[in-house]
Amino acid sequence: MARRKVSIIGAGNVGATAAYYIAEKVIADIVMVDITEGMTQAKALDFLHAGPMRGYDVSIRGSNDFSTIADSDLAVITAGLPRKPGMDRMDLLKVNTDIVKSAAKHIATYAPNATVIVVSNPLDVMCHVAFRTTGFAVRRVMGMAGILDSTRFRYFVAQEVGCALTDVHAMVLGGHGDQMVPLPRFTTVAGVPITQLLDKAVIDRIVERTRKGGAEIVGHLKTGSAYYAPAASVAEMAEAILTDRKTLAPCAVYLRGEYGIENLFIGVPVLLGKNGVERIIELDLDESEMALLNGSAEAVKKGVNDLDTFFVPR
């Protein structure tokens, strides 16, 4: 039986690290595509050299030719530019829209049966770009955000409680930005609600630090952003889809009335399996949680409205 195939478009820090993590899981052969001549080829060869020591034996190929993504089961879009000094939000939106649109066109042409994971920022809006450009079914296009935000939340909780990271289960909904919605009421340590383990002031501080988690890393790096945890999040999603693991995790998906939200990509809990988004889970949110989610949705909607002023899908 042929091994599954993952193609990663954009071989910068997130894309290349995601390729490495997926290789270590030995769940698929990997193609990395980037417009930078020689970079993907070098990284692919470096990964292959590490295989005998790290215990993986998969095909890893680097290319500048988008036709090499043909017949991929999964396509990951990490290509995009970070915001530079002097660049306003709309300029960044236009630049990354063009990049993601180009990637999505190649996916639709060469890998029409693939499931798509979008990583490029602004995440929730770029999901709309990929979805509209590919014309794929909604279950086959999703964004990586909630898993990353939730794992940051889990880490901060574990640090405060002093427990094992794996004992913490957490859920973060909403857009991938300052208005994300960490849910303390759905966060537990070995089944015990964190509200029984931590004071409200501590929980509030953790929630705020989670919202600023990416910015905190950018503040330290000065000239870059996080990539190990985002790449690990991509690898978790890839494994769930390619092995049909039925993982329940928050992802940016297209809502059609769930949570009272229409026609918008936003982070909610879903079941991931071989068909992509196999089920959207509707949590019983209280009034304050729902208000926060609606506020987050409004922020995403503003970005989509900005997109609609210039975007032509095909």
List PLM regions with ranges.
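N-terminal Rossmann-fold NAD(P) dinucleotide-binding loop
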Residues: 15-16
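Glycine-rich Rossmann-fold phosphate-binding loop(s) that bind the pyrophosphate
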Residues: 11-12
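Rossmann-like NAD(P)(H) cofactor-binding subdomain of soluble oxidoreductases
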Residues: 88-154
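C-terminal substrate-binding/catalytic lobe of Rossmann-fold NAD(P)-dependent dehydrogenases
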Residues: 134-139, 149-287, 291-314
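Conserved N-terminal Rossmann-fold NAD(P) cofactor-binding segment
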Residues: 33-72, 301-312
